[in-house]
């Protein structure tokens, strides 16, 4: 009897070692997964805004994604949060507000009311909400453009524009751990980068973890490394717009009305 118990104990220990080894192998494969740039197309717009269409590939997961990104200087450009109570399309709003580029904004409830903090032209229409999903705030202050944690928000500085969304994707140029890596969807994102630059854009079907890895590793320019980034409303809400120098525009329309937009204007 004692021998049987000993054999069972030994088998359990052996099984545990096997499971541990498998887990480490899976982790190692995941850790080796890297997104690499397959192709890049770029175009300069007004006020130094640069549009890029970037195709990236994760050979380990056998997955490709396409990003449409606008990169701009926080010295020459500023953010605006544009209210959209009538459900207007992004293109019409961007043209009317004379924006250089823009994307859809934050989350909203079934009654079309914004969820979380929203400040437009220094006027606040909703307050900071503490929730697991909306952990980030994009803001424009007199000091420039920033992406901060919701817990870091303070009214001590004058905020010109702000929008709360999330989750956080990149911090200190590293992807956030624990993000969902299985649910693929269109994504909209914003970020701040080195050399006082900022970026906003959309990405084709990718998980939150995948997008975080892309933003933290893919070089959009030789001297442009993403320091912080957060997710905006995505899926059917995702939309992107860029004003070309010749007066035309490149546009990826959303599939449903959204409550607000994030636009970029020249200072």
Question: Locations of the language-model features?
Answer:
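Short acidic-glycine loop/turn motifs at beta-strand connectors
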Residues: 73-75, 139-144, 171-172, 192-196, ...
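Flexible, D/E/H-enriched segments
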Residues: 33-60, 175, 244-267
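Active-site-adjacent helix-turn-beta-strand microarchitecture at beta-sheet edges
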Residues: 108-181
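A short, polar/proline- and glycine-enriched secondary-structure boundary/capping micro-motif
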Residues: 90-92, 156-161, 188-189, 209-214
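Bacterial N-terminal signal peptides
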Residues: 19-28
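Bacterial N-terminal signal peptides that target proteins for export
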Residues: 5-19
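Zymogen propeptides
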Residues: 32-129
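Conserved, well-ordered active-site substructure
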Residues: 112-132, 180-188, 192-231, 236-267
